[in-house]
Amino acid sequence: MQKEIRKTISKIKETGLQLLFPGRCPVCDGIVRPFGRKICPECLPKLKPVTAPWCMRCGKKLAEEREYCGDCMHREHKYDRARTLYEYRDVAPSIYRFKYSGRQEYGDFFGEEMARLLGDFIGRVRPDVIVPVPLYRGKLRKRGYNQAACLARALGR
């Protein structure tokens, strides 16, 4: 019973916060409607998901079918595999605002998009945990949050 009451209070609080402080679109930075998608309907088509073929190491879009991009063939990475959600040039301003302008709500949008677009890939990999890359203390103090942790939380939901 108490658990249900806490859940209801939490939902009321969340609803109030969304009404008082609506989120911002990660593409145009305009205000988005509460309780809807976390992106403007006009902006959604501007984001082009990276589709095959892509580099098996870094996830970068490839012009032709092959295993690795030119960078990964000549460079060693500290990871085995990565995937790219969108073309970088389409989301670069958004990533900048997410990292340096306090737009933590972008993490919810991108985390949900990661789950939607990369869910099959993540399911095949079957991770035991999702661990965000830690930030240096100075950067964490300056920004006030770890953007990788925002993404990991949203993806974990």
How would you name each of these model-derived features?
Residues M1-R157:
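Glycine-rich phosphate/pyrophosphate-handling loop used in enzymes and phosphotransfer proteins
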